């Protein structure tokens, strides 16, 4: 691929949290432009730098994204795995992509994910772990996904209070979950109820209620 050619990439943000949405983005752009603005994996950038690059990417590149809110994920995960959900969204996004698309691989086996996506979409793809650190278009997609998810998390913070990052490793998130699950019969609006962390807390709460 020459510097003047376009590159397409797909990446997600928010796959692991117990609170908030997962965002999956497709970016197709001139490779020379992506290198000029020095995109890199969103996790290696400050929030300010991500926002700056986000504006440049949105202004010059072809961008599509999907926001899967907790209620969407809860409904889908009643019947499908998270991998299958992400696979479905990727296949849908590929309708808007150029011929070859690089994907940050969601499966532990790269070849399996690549074969399934190519078979379902009829498109040529390359699925790689840590693709966001290898291919500029995937880096750009990771930035778009992260910035959009951060904006969604900010809105949830404004509405529900400080729940931290939303990741199960965050003590603030766990403290919020304990209180929120105790006070709300239907937590599915912001909480991913199929996550093991949530199931353990729900089970613990039910057991405590039985004691009184």
Curated annotation (Swiss-Prot):
Keywords: Cytoplasm, Endonuclease, Hydrolase, Manganese, Metal-binding, Nuclease
Superkingdom to which the source organism belongs: Archaea
Broadest EC class assigned to this enzyme: hydrolase
Keyword Metal-binding carried by entry: yes
CDD domains the record matches: RNase_HII_archaea_like
Entry-linked InterPro entries: RNase_H2_suA, RNase_HII/HIII, RNase_HII/HIII_dom, RNase_HII_arc, RNase_HII_hlx-loop-hlx_cap_dom, RNaseH-like_sf, RNaseH_sf
Cofactor(s) listed in the protein's UniProt record: Mn(2+); Mg(2+)
Disulfide bonds listed in the record: none
Stretches assigned to the RNase H type-2 domain: 5-207
Signal peptide boundaries: none
Binding site for a divalent metal cation: 11-12, 104
CC cofactor note: Manganese or magnesium. Binds 1 divalent metal ion per monomer in the absence of substrate. May bind a second metal ion after substrate binding.
One MF annotation (Gene Ontology) recorded for this entry: RNA binding
Subcellular locations according to the entry: Cytoplasm
Family: Belongs to the RNase HII family.
Protein name (record): Ribonuclease HII
Species: Thermoplasma acidophilum (strain ATCC 25905 / DSM 1728 / JCM 9062 / NBRC 15155 / AMRC-C165)
Lineage: Archaea, Methanobacteriati, Thermoplasmatota, Thermoplasmata, Thermoplasmatales
Encoding gene (name): rnhB
């Amino acid at each position: 691929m020459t510097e003047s050619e376009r590159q397409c990439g797909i990446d997600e943000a928010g796959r692991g949290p117990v609170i908030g949405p997962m965002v999956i983005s497709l970016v197709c752009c001139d490779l020379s432009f992506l290198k000029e603005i020095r995109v890199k994996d969103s996790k290696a950038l400050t929030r300010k730098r991500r926002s700056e690059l986000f504006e440049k990417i949105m202004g010059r590149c072809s961008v599509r994204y999907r926001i899967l809110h907790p209620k969407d994920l809860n409904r889908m995960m009643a019947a499908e795995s998270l991998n299958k959900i992400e696979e479905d969204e990727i296949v849908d996004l590929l309708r808007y992509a150029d011929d070859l698309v690089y994907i940050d691989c969601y499966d532990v086996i790269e070849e399996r994910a690549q074969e399934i996506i190519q078979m379902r979409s009829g498109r040529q793809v390359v699925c790689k772990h840590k693709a966001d650190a290898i291919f500029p278009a995937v880096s750009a997609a990771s930035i778009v996904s992260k910035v959009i998810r951060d904006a969604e998390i900010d809105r949830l913070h404004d509405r529900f209070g400080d729940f931290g990052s939303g990741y199960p490793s965050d003590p603030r998130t766990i403290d919020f979950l304990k209180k929120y699950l105790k006070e709300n019969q239907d937590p599915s609006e912001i909480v991913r109820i199929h996550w093991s962390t949530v199931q353990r807390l729900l089970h613990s709460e039910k057991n405590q209620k039985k004691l009184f």
